[in-house]
Amino acid sequence: MALQNMIPTQGDERGKVISYGSCQFPTLGFVVDRYLRVRNFVPEPFWYIKVAHTKDKIDVKFNWRRGHLFDRMAVIIIFERCLLAKTAKVIKMAKKPTKKWKPLPLTTVELQKNGSRFLRMTSQEVMKVAEDLYTKGWISYPRTETDQFDRGMDLRALVARQTQDNAWGQFAQSLMDGGFKQPRDGRNNDKAHPPIHPVNYVASTQLNQNEKRVYEFVVRRFLACCSEDAVGEATDIEIDYGGEFFHAHGLTVIARNYLNVYPYDKWVSSQELPQYTVGETFEPTEANTHDGQTSAPAYLTEPELIALMDANGIGTDATMAEHIAKVQEREYVIARPKGGSGAPANNDNGGGRGRGRGRGGARGGRGGRGGRGGAAAQNGGGGTVGIQEFIPTTLGVALIEGYDNVGIETSLSKPFLRKEVGACSCCGVGAGRCQNQALANTLDRWKFR
């Protein structure tokens, strides 16, 4: 940082801080890494086959098991082999019960991720509001890694306090009337604080707009935890058409259960599938080839960034939001509404990201339109209205590229050095090593080579 004092600054540039932080820079590194992947992305064309069949007045769309291929001629040859077969044979027809699991009890990291995704607030704003709600006695301590409730907690008493609310009171009452189920146990217990949950009821008229959003999310998450999993029936059909395999999937939601109080998860019935029998043969109503191209990944969003930081040990549940705010304050990163330059499309063919258009028509003729690129997420999840994505500034990119070339063996912009230092410190304490030795090992990692 000695160079900073040698560079003349004028006007608004005077007094700006350019600093290195062992958590701050990996945070910036995640943003820059995704940005470079987007900027350097080169789309590739691909081709795939889709088959359709109408039975009992229901149009069934079969997706190619291969997904897609990047060799057009290979797809054409395979497609012609399918056409020569003329008929398809059903080799699998299965209906089985399925569930969408209710959410785990709420941790700080999950509160920040979901707050950024659903509440139109930054993670720092979410934590500030949560702390205010805790201070006022409405929710439990909002800084916790615990995602399991102790068996001794009287959760029913907490549910009962929510029965008076106009929005979710009826659902809370249904839990009191026999619908209550013990929450799922996660893997984490910090032995200090329980999962985040409402401790008292407060009317929305007593809260400001942001407090309403956070309090409602905490309450609905808690009630969802105390409810039953959503129940459905999944139908899977697989056919053999000219030696190639195609499949169709259908879902019927039977009981929404926790979804009735937790609108942040989406799980809806898909296309209705008619009854087939194994061994049945039929002539496809339509068989088409489609082309598309891979598309660049999206820029990093705040929920994704928090997840990366959590997985790589960058910051704690109490400091992640601060690190994200700091790289914006230093003007290394700017935030903008997600999809500002167009959101990438999804491919119902399940073969990768990209956009596609159909070729051919019934039995291989021309006409028709295809699907969009990319496998759509199958695990539900709510909308993304209000989510922000991060774009590094020229300064942010320059800092990462500069620090990557200073001569240290382990990159300063990656999470590995910070993780190694943390592991070394923990190991030193746990094994009773000499503190000076642990310090020497840490300093050695930072030496220029």
Task: Name each model feature, range by range.
Residues 1-449:
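Core catalytic DNA strand-manipulation module of type IA topoisomerases
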